[in-house]
């Protein structure tokens, strides 16, 4: 099986909430695509409810694009402790941190209908929790986001 970057991360050494550059790939044409780990909860000490992380996905997909150029995708982690974000290019981690903070502030203040929540727009449109999503955003902001360096497992 191919190596998976997140399986080499020592999840006991990172301290959420944080932004971490998880990797950079170069396309055959020479473009860079950067993947960021946008962690909200400490690994193995909790998980975001599926309805809340689904709502965070919808909100952060838009709000991160409002604050950072060239966002390709924002997707929830399977462990439900945060999101992955793919971006064209190699924005610096401090810039990504500022964009993530701004997007979380927007999420915490969101008081309108959740975007993309209809049977036509979403594959599970009934599974959302705006209140819980806003609470996770507020909690991460209250704890203070930081840039986290990658800590590899010692094997």
Curated annotation (Swiss-Prot):
Keywords: Autoinducer synthesis, Iron, Lyase, Metal-binding, Quorum sensing. It comes from the Bacteria. Homodimer. Binds 1 Fe cation per subunit. Its EC number is 4.4.1.21. This is S-ribosylhomocysteine lyase. The keyword Metal-binding applies. It is an enzyme of class 4 (lyase). Coiled coil: none annotated. Its cofactor is Fe cation. Belongs to the LuxS family. One of its GO terms (biological process) is quorum sensing. InterPro entries: LuxS_sf, Metalloenz_LuxS/M16, S-ribosylhomocysteinase. GO terms for molecular function: iron ion binding; S-ribosylhomocysteine lyase activity. Involved in the synthesis of autoinducer 2 (AI-2) which is secreted by bacteria and is used to communicate both the cell density and the metabolic potential of the environment. The regulation of gene expression in response to changes in cell density is called quorum sensing. Catalyzes the transformation of S-ribosylhomocysteine (RHC) to homocysteine (HC) and 4,5-dihydroxy-2,3-pentadione (DPD). SUPFAM superfamilies: LuxS/MPP-like metallohydrolase. The keyword Glycoprotein does not apply. It catalyses: S-(5-deoxy-D-ribos-5-yl)-L-homocysteine = (S)-4,5-dihydroxypentane-2,3-dione + L-homocysteine. Pfam families: LuxS. Fe cation binds at residues 54, 58, 122.
